[in-house]
Amino acid sequence: MRTNRLSRRDFLAAVGTCGAGAVVASAAGGVSGEGQKVKLSTPHAEKIGWRLCCQLYTFRDRTFYEAMEVLAGLGIRRVEPAFFLPLSKEQPDLKTSEMLAPAQRRELKRRLEDRGMLMASYYAPLEADTSGFRKVFDFAKEMGVETLVAEPPAQVFEALDSLCQEYKINLAIHNHSEAAGSKYWRPENVLRVCEGRSKAIGGCPDTGHYVRTGLDPSECLKKLQGRMICVHLKDVAEMGNPESRDVPLGEGKANYTQVLKTLRALNFRGLVTIEYEHLSPQLVEDVAKCVKFVEDFAATVDV
């Protein structure tokens, strides 16, 4: 995600015969019809404790409610909205955030429940001003969020840790690239702010931003062993280029088979969140390829 640049039985059968293109067709209107519960597309990933999610910055060219229907077609039940992204086409200035009015929150919860979907995580505005933190946690609790994803400054972690324990909600520290000015561009910086804090605070390593910085994502994950709460799954075309575009998992420089092997070797269990930043004409197909890559790998793992 670059916030400074706002500018699945059916699935598996389809993928096995026709590849990701078949998934796109189902996303357009087949596997999980409007109003029906989402048919999970990643049963093997679930068996090894990888609960697939999607960061909705991926679909920032549409609203939350529009993106929900795409994800339903892809068999993805869990979503991670970002506080600056629009909720509905009818009210484009309305953001999916703690600023929603009670009636709007009820409508959001109802739509998620009707689809059998979960707001598992939330990319939240947790910055230097602590005055709005409780409002963020109240919203997260109401929506059933298990993990807040953010990049807070070091001085607010005491307040955040207290709220995490009170609300029983995790805080996962996200990284952008070094060139983007992220405080957490390397895992050591994440571990430093976790020192002395409860296990409710940990990392949300973004593998794509590690590659953009010129770091080996698998080695970065190893450094975060025992302190990873969730992971942003992302592959990019070029190593060490901060402007390099996203590509489907396994097609870039992250060595994504090794990334998944590393997560498995570390016995990681939790949210694995696809985030795809490149608004390509074949965006849904590219995301479907990412889903397939994770599920295909998980299918090879002995449980």
Residue spans for each PLM region:
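A short acidic, helix-capping loop that chelates divalent metal ions and anchors anionic groups
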Residues: 87-93, 180, 212, 239-244
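Flexible loop residues that form catalytic
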Residues: 84, 127, 153, 236, ...
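Glycine-rich, proline-tolerant flexible connector loops at the mouths of alpha/beta enzymes
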Residues: 82-107
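Active-site acidic/histidine proton-transfer and metal-coordination neighborhood
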Residues: 10, 15-16, 20-23, 44, ...
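Structural recognition of the beta-strand scaffold that forms the well-ordered cores
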Residues: 80-81, 121, 149, 273
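Histidine-acidic metal/acid-base catalytic patches
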Residues: 2-56, 60-77, 141, 187, ...
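Residue-level recognition of beta-strand->loop/alpha-helix junctions
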Residues: 58, 82-83, 123, 175
